[in-house]
């Protein structure tokens, strides 16, 4: 049987099509929404899903799978759940939550998923990093030995912080916790502009959790005016954002900071504040029907903060010698540091800066309680000159606070007690500092040296700030620069400094 030419042509065409036929299917695992409400969706059918995997709803809203149960999956929704209905399709993305990281992020304000919210357009060249990763192991770490200066006399002298340390800032609302954090960012400006290599530069990441949008906008303005935004990243999960984003923001910020840590650079991350993250996590856990524990927090709320703060570390020389320093902030209620979340974070961190309302209202700002504040590892990183100068400072201040409480009751005090009260009042006056005016470490050394060695003892309290300005404006720059060196305060420098301070004190008096 012979085919006509037309039929033969068709046969050839069909044969060629069949031999070149291939399937290019993309198979997505999908599920259906069983119930939705309060930002939680229960989904049936996602049998292969991973814990912490991102999913996408039919409306375009994303979510994260947190509860993997026999019958369904509990998904927390990133955004409004009003567009999600029962029976809607839910698609797996196959990826665990990740965020952009890299130097392209500097100077930008992003949300908890790394999406820019500052109106400056899309992010340029960047890599993506998972928000949840394991902290560096013991072998990969090195003990803290480099200083991380805050620019605050009270902190750098009494509770010094090193690169790679975790130092908690704890206090009631409106006691100046955020002010300490912002001053620390501003203080890096001088170091970063002077630093010729990456080993000196300190990049900053500020994570705002549950704050007002107006507060975040004000912070952006302060950093912009001080030219500090160029080395900073702001991650904002504001009060109007859903609880899952407030829970996720610290991990996202940490992933951005880890980019610098893992590439031999140095970064500082501020979590402001972790109390609000714990509240957001409690909300999610209760809605997911996880059993509540103390103060209705879930049983793993300690792990929530420990796995985050353990990622701040000083890396060993073999792994690049980078570092990530963390300053978590915790808000207390009526000064109660023995509540659940404060005790958890105190036990995780390497020390704490305790702020008190009473000191704040007495005009002692920063309102640091010297007795309760401690730095467990920072003294190893402190400059030698600062260590020499402030050796007796903490003891004298603690004794002063103790004696001052009893001095209110008795009028006839012996000469030694009066001298202690006199010196203590002047040391307290010297530790005061205006907001947004961080001091370089060498200038701090001069001021504290003058106070500890009695150059202010006969001076009226209201003249001390004037004396401080006078010595800082007229001191020999070469002498000032020498305090930054590793040698510390030599006898020749002490003699020169003593003569200068005595002369300036005479002029003020």
Swiss-Prot record:
GO terms for biological process: proton motive force-driven ATP synthesis. Its main location: mitochondrion. The record marks 373 as: Required for activity. GO terms for cellular component: mitochondrial inner membrane; mitochondrion; proton-transporting ATP synthase complex. It is found in: Mitochondrion; Mitochondrion inner membrane. It comes from the Eukaryota. GO terms for molecular function: ADP binding; ATP binding; proton-transporting ATP synthase activity, rotational mechanism. Mitochondrial membrane ATP synthase (F(1)F(0) ATP synthase or Complex V) produces ATP from ADP in the presence of a proton gradient across the membrane which is generated by electron transport complexes of the respiratory chain. F-type ATPases consist of two structural domains, F(1) - containing the extramembraneous catalytic core, and F(0) - containing the membrane proton channel, linked together by a central stalk and a peripheral stalk. During catalysis, ATP synthesis in the catalytic domain of F(1) is coupled via a rotary mechanism of the central stalk subunits to proton translocation. F-type ATPases have 2 components, CF(1) - the catalytic core - and CF(0) - the membrane proton channel. CF(1) has five subunits: alpha(3), beta(3), gamma(1), delta(1), epsilon(1). CF(0) has three main subunits: a, b and c. This is ATP synthase subunit alpha, mitochondrial. It comes from Oryza sativa subsp. japonica. The lineage of its organism: Eukaryota, Viridiplantae, Streptophyta, Embryophyta, Tracheophyta.
């Amino acid at each position: 049987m012979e085919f006509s030419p037309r039929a033969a042509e068709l046969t050839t065409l069909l044969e060629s099509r069949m031999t070149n036929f291939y399937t290019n299917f993309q198979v997505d695992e999908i599920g259906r929404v069983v119930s939705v409400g309060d930002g939680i969706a229960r989904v049936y059918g996602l049998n292969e899903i991973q814990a912490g995997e991102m999913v996408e709803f039919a409306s375009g809203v994303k979510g994260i799978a947190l509860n993997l149960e026999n019958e369904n999956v509990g998904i927390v929704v990133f955004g409004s759940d009003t567009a999600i209905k029962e029976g809607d399709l839910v698609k797996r993305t196959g990826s665990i939550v990740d965020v952009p990281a890299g130097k392209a992020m500097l100077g930008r304000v992003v949300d908890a998923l790394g999406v820019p919210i500052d109106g400056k357009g899309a992010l340029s060249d960047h890599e993506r990093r998972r928000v949840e990763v394991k902290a560096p192991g013991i072998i990969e770490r090195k003990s803290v030995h480099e200083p991380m200066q805050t620019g605050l006399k009270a902190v750098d002298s009494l509770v010094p912080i090193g690169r790679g340390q975790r130092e908690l800032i704890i206090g009631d609302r409106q006691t100046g916790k955020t002010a300490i954090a912002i001053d620390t960012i501003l203080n890096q400006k001088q170091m970063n502009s002077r630093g010729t290599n990456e080993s000196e530069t300190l990049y900053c990441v500020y994570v705002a959790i549950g704050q007002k949008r107006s507060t975040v906008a004000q912070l952006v303005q302060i950093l912009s005016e001080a030219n500090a935004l160029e080395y900073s990243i702001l991650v904002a999960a504001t009060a109007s954002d859903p609880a899952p984003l407030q829970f996720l923001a610290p991990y996202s910020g940490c992933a951005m900071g880890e980019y610098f840590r893992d590439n031999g650079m140095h970064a500082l991350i501020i979590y402001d504040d972790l109390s609000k993250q714990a509240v957001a996590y409690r909300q999610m856990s209760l809605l997911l029907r996880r059993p509540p524990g103390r103060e209705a927090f879930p049983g793993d709320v300690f792990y929530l903060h420990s796995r985050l703060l353990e990622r701040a570390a000083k890396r060993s020389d073999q792994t690049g010698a980078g570092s990530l320093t963390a300053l978590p902030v915790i808000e207390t209620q009526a000064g109660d540091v023995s509540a659940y979340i404060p005790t958890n974070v105190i036990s995780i961190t390497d020390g704490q800066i305790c702020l008190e309302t009473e000191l704040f209202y007495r005009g002692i700002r920063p309102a640091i309680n010297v007795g309760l504040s401690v730095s467990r590892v920072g003294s190893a990183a402190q400059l030698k000159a600062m260590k020499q100068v402030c050796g007796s400072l903490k003891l004298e201040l603690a004794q002063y606070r103790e004696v001052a409480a009893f001095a209110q009751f008795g009028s006839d005090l012996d000469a030694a007690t009066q001298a202690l009260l006199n010196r203590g009042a002047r040391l307290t006056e010297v530790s005061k500092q205006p907001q947004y005016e961080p001091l370089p470490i060498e200038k701090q050394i001069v001021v504290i040296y003058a106070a500890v060695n009695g150059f202010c003892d006969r001076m009226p309290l209201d003249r001390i700030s004037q004396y401080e300005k006078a010595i800082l404006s007229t001191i020999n720059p070469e002498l000032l620069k020498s305090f930054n060196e590793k040698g510390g305060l030599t006898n020749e420098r002490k003699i020169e400094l003593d003569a200068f301070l005595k002369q300036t004190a005479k002029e003020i008096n």
